[in-house]
Amino acid sequence: MSRPIIVFDLDGTLIDTAPDLLDSLNHSLAASELTAVDEAGFRRFVGHGGRVMIERAHAAQQRSLDVAEHDRLLKLFLDHYTDNIPGKSRPYPGVIEAIARFEKAGYLLAICTNKYEANSLALIEALGLTRHFAAIAGQDTFAFRKPDPRHLTETIRLAGGDAHRALMVGDSQTDIDTAKAAGIPVVAVDFGYTDRHVREFEPSAVISHFDALTVELAERLIRAAGH
């Protein structure tokens, strides 16, 4: 019988990668001779990958990009980010304890992220967390990505988990919409990378610290989903 599973988003959910993403974004903006972005600006641009982040940051300074320049800046961004992994990125408070809690309760753990798979694997490895995850699926692991629900359901399949006893944990509308489309309950963290409060997207529950992500909460939400 397949085991229950918790599937986490990565950036802004499990790991606070904002300082490194911001550094890499500003590295690419400097190549366009644009003003560096602060943390508040970063939150307006993040959430859909590096390409969209770069486009939004340029648009905010009334600068358009052709395809070739966009590709060049994305490569600068990705190379800078990859070369500095793990940089300043660290797990959010309570993450390590939550991992131990769910492992003790017999849950599988997985990651479903729109970060590139190689960078996701490198980050988790650099932080010493790889052994805890049965699957780590990035935006290029499959032929589809969040908010396509197959990204989540295929991550669960890859991990060997039970989709009828699954819970998603994320920080964005994309995560919430993905889980809903898959028929899987979703807990939203309210400390991630979005400029709107996650309650607006109607997740199954909202937490402000990983201490609140208890086995009891997970089991209650999974039961309520009616699988």
From Swiss-Prot:
The keyword Hydrolase applies. It comes from the Bacteria. HAMAP family: GPH_hydrolase_bact. Its cofactor is Mg(2+). Mg(2+) binds at residues 9, 11, 171. The active site is at 9 (nucleophile). One of its GO terms (biological process) is DNA repair. Belongs to the HAD-like hydrolase superfamily. CbbY/CbbZ/Gph/YieH family. Specifically catalyzes the dephosphorylation of 2-phosphoglycolate. Is involved in the dissimilation of the intracellular 2-phosphoglycolate formed during the DNA repair of 3'-phosphoglycolate ends, a major class of DNA lesions induced by oxidative stress. This is Phosphoglycolate phosphatase. The keyword Metal-binding applies. GO terms for cellular component: cytosol. Pfam families: HAD_2 (PF13419). It comes from Mesorhizobium japonicum (strain LMG 29417 / CECT 9101 / MAFF 303099) (Mesorhizobium loti (strain MAFF 303099)). GO terms for molecular function: metal ion binding; phosphoglycolate phosphatase activity. InterPro entries: HAD-like_hydrolase_sf, HAD-like_sf, HAD-SF_hydro_IA, HAD_2, HAD_sf, PGP-like_dom2, PGPase_prok. Keywords: Carbohydrate metabolism, Hydrolase, Magnesium, Metal-binding. Its EC number is 3.1.3.18. Pathway: Organic acid metabolism; glycolate biosynthesis; glycolate from 2-phosphoglycolate: step 1/1. It catalyses: 2-phosphoglycolate + H2O = glycolate + phosphate.
